[in-house]
């Protein structure tokens, strides 16, 4: 037969040559690719491969995953599904026959060692007992010898020796009993220790055998020559292991459901527990009193015995429901707490910060007050305002005020027309309310505000936009009410006043009279020892204009006005309007910094990016420094006069701040317009509703106000009540007008007048405003107003009588009474009464009145007529028809 080489054998069995060479080497045969292979070598290689393939694995690891869904209840009564994955890993080890033989040999050696140790212990115990017996015999012999010697030596003391011997024998017997008991206890302790040690060794050996053998102890080992059943045996063992694992897991689950860990411990450690221990474990597993323990799926925590104190964050306003949610309590508990504090509220009602703080602290929580304008503060703080050390001198901002027709407008027009360059004359029509004038000594910015209302609003908002007030007083007219109001506003703002005595060119001018009158209000000239400069000017001829400008600049130099030119700009809105082509336009007077085109401006409720800037003559400018008025375009809406304009970094944050301001303004407005409370509603639901005449009273002095209030309240009666909504001393302000509009009241001014802002509100709301200088005139007009609110009286007046002479029948009107007018006049469609024997039997309306077949409107005394009574046909001859009319009598208050 041809020799088979390793290479040809590899090609025949379709395996690489290198692998076949390696397999020969593993079988102990050294071959190369060109060496020949004999039949015996082939059989040797096949036997080697069969042994390798037929060897079952000693260890098998099974990993199983179990997925399930658990529904967990959450807040709000809803449940949440949670995906749960349980991973189990079991490792099964097959016992090695050699290891089993070795373990059996070790077990045999251990048992022999235990038997040897037990025999040794028994021998030691026997020897110890033998030595104890010998010692006992020796002691007894010695005692006997002593006893004999004592009897022979002391015959005289036999009785005494006998008495002494008895307790010695008793003590000897007691000692022997104690020694025997100790020997018995020692033997029992030794035997118990040996048995315990043997039991522990046996238990450890059994546990090790179970770990080594696992569940494969009884599995038949595969035959050495059987290589085809390898996968079948492996899968069979795996299935058995999985089934056993499933049974074990199911048993654990059932044991947990029935009794928890105590039951499981009872089952697993039954071999090592006594019967009493098992009974005790069974009692514990059933709850101690024979009751079934609850399922482990129930909640393992109890309701807290103490209330949980929380940190409650409260803003400026909060609803009752939100407050209850933050304290983790029900809304009804919060309402109960508020009722205990004396406040009634619903669950959706908005309460203020103080009330919410009291309620939260009453319920034992810690309150953290939060300012809702934190964003606004952060936006304002994140601004580059420049260094205060780099402050430079700036132009003064001058507001010209004065009474109507005192030449204020003419003075402004003259200054503007003479100081504005000729090339800029065409831009005068672009009047924006503010402009600056260049003089030889410096620049001055004038504010042309419409009256003093805008000036007051600016001072109230702390704009600090006005530095100097020029008070214009006509030399021929003197001090007037608006002049006094201007002085009061200037003093309230702590702004210096420069007095311009206008119309000095008139023949009737009297400058000294103006000085005397102004002195009464605290404006004292410098030549009289005061601080106010007085300049005589004429807006018509231009006399004294330069002196006025010099006085303004001198006052500004004394004030040392400075501003930071670098950094983000801030200013105040002088006026604003809506232009059709350009949108919202605002006139801004820059106070600090530099306003550039493209800056983001936050202005009151509005915001936006500056798209264009123009000066007072309509020219486009790229930037504006301090004390320069400019028109800006690009805001989201028309801002209010007096609002502060601020340049910020982030347009998004500017929008949020503007929206927050709008929301707060809306809340305040709605709160002011809130309807009457429940108590007022019940108070108004009384029988015979009493009319109320609401009055807002302003007087010049407090005594007059009290006297008028008492006199008006005494005019009240059962039908009309006079209610003084508000009273005070001083002029009628915008607040008074707003109060009168809200309460539907009449404004009464006693020796006082309303200012411009109040007049605007009065005109807009169409309020009733009356001025008085005599208290009696005021009381009489209030009486007339109350009389108009009284219910009128009605009186029936008889205007005619007609006697029925005959009765006719008409197909159209029924019974027609032929009558003779005996008194007065009978008129058609008037009310009538039918009297029979001076008793009223019917009251109705006269429907038809005829004379000689002609319809007439009236029939006078002594004439005959036919009368048809509406809806009444029982008219008889001899009846009297009484014609009357109802007259309304206007009531008056005495």
UniProtKB/Swiss-Prot annotation:
Region feature Disordered, mapped onto this chain: 52-301
Domain tr-type G: 393-562
Residue span of region G3: 448-451
Gene Ontology MF terms in the entry: GTP binding; GTPase activity; guanosine tetraphosphate binding; translation initiation factor activity
Protein origin, superkingdom: Bacteria
Location of the region described as G4 in the Swiss-Prot/TrEMBL record: 502-505
Residues engaged in binding GTP: 402-409, 448-452, 502-505
Matching CDD domains: IF2_eIF5B, IF2_mtIF2_II, mtIF2_IVc
Annotated Basic residues bias: 255-269
Function: One of the essential components for the initiation of protein synthesis. Protects formylmethionyl-tRNA from spontaneous hydrolysis and promotes its binding to the 30S ribosomal subunits. Also involved in the hydrolysis of GTP during the formation of the 70S ribosomal complex.
Full protein name: Translation initiation factor IF-2
Species per Swiss-Prot/TrEMBL record: Sodalis glossinidius (strain morsitans)
């Amino acid at each position: 037969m041809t020799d088979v080489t390793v290479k040809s054998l590899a090609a025949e069995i379709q395996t690489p040559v290198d692998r076949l060479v390696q397999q020969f080497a593993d079988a102990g045969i050294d071959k190369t690719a060109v060496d020949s292979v004999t039949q015996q070598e082939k059989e040797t290689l096949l036997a080697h491969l069969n042994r390798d393939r037929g060897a079952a694995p000693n260890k098998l690891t099974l990993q199983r995953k179990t997925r399930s869904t658990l529904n967990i209840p959450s807040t709000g009564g809803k449940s949440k599904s949670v995906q749960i994955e349980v991973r189990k890993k079991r490792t099964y080890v097959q016992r090695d026959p050699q290891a089993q033989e070795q373990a059996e040999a070790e077990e045999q050696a251990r048992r022999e060692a235990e038997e040897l140790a037990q025999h040794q212990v028994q021998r030691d115990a026997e020897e110890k007992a033998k030595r104890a017996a010998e010692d006992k015999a020796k002691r007894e012999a010695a005692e006997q010898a002593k006893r004999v010697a004592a009897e022979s030596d002391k015959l005289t003391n036999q009785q005494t020796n006998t008495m002494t011997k008895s307790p010695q024998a008793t003590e000897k017997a007691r000692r022997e009993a104690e020694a025997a008991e100790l020997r018995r206890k020692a033997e029992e302790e030794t035997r118990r220790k040996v048995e315990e040690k043997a039991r522990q060794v046996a238990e450890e050996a059994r546990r090790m055998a179970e770990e080594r053998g696992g569940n494969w102890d009884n599995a038949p080992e595969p035959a050495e020559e059987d290589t085809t059943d390898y996968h079948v045996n492996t899968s069979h063992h795996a299935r058995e292991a999985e089934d056993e694992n499933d049974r074990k897991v199911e048993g654990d689950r059932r044991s947990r459901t029935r009794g928890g860990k105590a039951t499981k411990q009872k089952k697993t450690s039954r071999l090592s527990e006594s019967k009493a221990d098992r009974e005790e474990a069974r009692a514990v597993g059933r709850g101690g009193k024979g009751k079934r323990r609850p399922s482990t799926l129930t909640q393992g925590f109890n309701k807290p015995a103490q209330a949980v104190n929380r940190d409650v964050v409260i803003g400026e306003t909060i609803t009752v429901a939100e407050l209850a949610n933050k304290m983790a309590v029900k809304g009804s508990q919060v309402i109960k707490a508020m009722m205990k504090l004396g406040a009634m509220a619903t669950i959706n009602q908005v309460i203020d910060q103080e009330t919410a703080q009291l309620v939260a602290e009453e319920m034992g929580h810690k309150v953290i007050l939060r300012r809702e304008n934190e964003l606004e503060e952060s936006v304002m703080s994140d601004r580059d305002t420049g260094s205060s050390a780099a402050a430079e001198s700036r132009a003064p901002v001058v507001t010209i005020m004065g009474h109507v027709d005192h030449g204020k407008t003419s003075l402004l027009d003259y200054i503007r027309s003479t100081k504005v360059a000729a090339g800029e004359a065409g831009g005068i029509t672009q009047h924006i309310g503010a402009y600056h004038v260049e003089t030889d000594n410096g620049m001055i910015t004038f504010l042309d505000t419409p009256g003093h209302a805008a000036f007051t609003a600016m001072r109230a908002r702390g704009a600090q936009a006005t530095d100097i007030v020029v008070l214009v007083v006509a030399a021929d007219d003197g001090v007037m009410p608006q002049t006094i109001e201007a002085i009061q506003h200037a003093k309230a703002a702590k702004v210096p006043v420069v007095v311009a005595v206008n119309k000095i060119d008139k023949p009737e001018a009297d400058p000294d009279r103006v000085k005397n009158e102004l002195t009464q209000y605290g404006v004292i000239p410098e030549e009289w020892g005061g601080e106010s400069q007085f300049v005589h000017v004429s807006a018509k001829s231009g006399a004294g204009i330069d002196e006025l400008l010099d006085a303004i600049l001198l006052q500004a130099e004394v004030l040392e006005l400075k501003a930071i030119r670098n950094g983000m700009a801030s200013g105040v809105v002088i006026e604003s309007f809506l232009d059709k082509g350009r949108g919202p336009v605002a006139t801004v007077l820059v106070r600090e910094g530099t306003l550039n085109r493209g800056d983001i401006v936050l202005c009151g409720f509005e915001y936006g990016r500056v798209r264009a800037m123009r000066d007072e003559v309509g020219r486009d400018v790229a930037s504006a420094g301090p004390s320069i008025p400019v028109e800006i375009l690009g805001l989201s809406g028309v801002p209010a006069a007096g609002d502060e304009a601020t340049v910020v970094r982030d347009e998004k944050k500017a929008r949020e701040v503007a929206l927050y301001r709008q929301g707060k303004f809306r809340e305040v407005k709605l709160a002011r317009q809130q309807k009457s409370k429940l108590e007022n509603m019940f108070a108004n639901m009384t029988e015979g509703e009493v009319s109320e005449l609401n009055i807002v009273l302003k007087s010049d002095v407090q005594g007059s106000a009290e006297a008028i209030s008492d006199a008006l309240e005494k005019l009240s009666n059962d039908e009309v009540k006079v209610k003084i909504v508000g009273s005070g001393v001083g002029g009628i302000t915008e607040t008074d007008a707003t109060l009168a509009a809200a309460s539907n009241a009449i404004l009464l001014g006693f020796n006082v007048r309303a200012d411009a802002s109040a007049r605007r509100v009065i005109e807009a709301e169409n309020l009733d405003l009356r001025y008085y200088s005599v208290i009696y005139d005021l009381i009489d007009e209030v009486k007339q107003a109350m009389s108009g609110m009284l219910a009128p009286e009605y009186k029936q007046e008889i205007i005619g009588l007609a006697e029925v002479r005959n009765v006719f029948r008409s197909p159209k009107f029924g019974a027609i009474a032929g009558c003779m007018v005996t008194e007065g006049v009978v008129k058609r469609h008037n009310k009538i009464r039918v009297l029979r024997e001076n008793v009223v039997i019917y009251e109705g309306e006269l429907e038809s009145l005829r004379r000689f077949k002609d319809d007439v409107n009236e029939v006078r005394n002594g004439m005959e007529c036919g009368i048809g009574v509406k809806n009444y046909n029982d008219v008889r001859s001899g009846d009297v028809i009484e014609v009357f009319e109802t007259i309304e009598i206007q009531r008056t208050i005495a």
